[in-house]
């Protein structure tokens, strides 16, 4: 199950968003405006991927899953485009299923048995992780996701990554 990458555009993602198939995971660690934006969107459209004490302790730097519409994508473009703000997720699954899927990957275990936060939603991390994953890992990580889109602030390009 290799991956295929191609350039995409915000216009293409906006068309998918109109059909309700686009989510974004916004990384508050590199974009301090994210927690307030998530709060303004409300719990039906935006929620931290963290639960419990992690959510309480790390709300200011947490990843937030948001159902994306054209307004949110435009906000990302105008407010966050020059930062490593997060990733786009294309999925027909409902909000709760997408959140549950990604919560499974927030922590990883090191070879020494320590637990670490896995920042897969960082656009600098996701492509490297996907390229180094085997078929079973890709199948598990894609799950209900049809594709990911990552933005590179360095060259200002948006890339769509699909499992093939």
What are these regions (language model features)?
Residues 1-118, 123-164:
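Terminal low-complexity "docking" segments
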């Amino acid at each position: 199950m290799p991956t295929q990458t191609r350039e995409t555009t915000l216009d293409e993602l906006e068309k998918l968003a109109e059909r309700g198939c686009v989510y974004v995971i916004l990384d508050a660690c590199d974009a301090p405006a994210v927690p307030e934006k998530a709060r303004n969107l409300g719990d039906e459209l935006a929620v931290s991927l963290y639960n419990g004490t992690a959510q309480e302790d790390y709300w200011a730097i947490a990843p937030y899953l948001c159902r994306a519409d054209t307004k949110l994508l435009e906000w990302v473009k105008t407010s966050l485009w020059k930062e490593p703000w997060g990733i786009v997720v294309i999925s027909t699954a409902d909000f709760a299923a997408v959140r549950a899927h990604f919560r499974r990957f927030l922590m990883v275990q090191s070879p020494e048995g320590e637990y670490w936060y896995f920042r897969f939603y960082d656009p600098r991390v996701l492509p490297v992780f996907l390229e180094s994953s085997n078929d079973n890992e890709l199948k598990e990580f894609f799950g209900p996701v049809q594709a990911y889109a990552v933005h590179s602030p360095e060259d200002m390009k948006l890339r769509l990554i699909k499992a093939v």
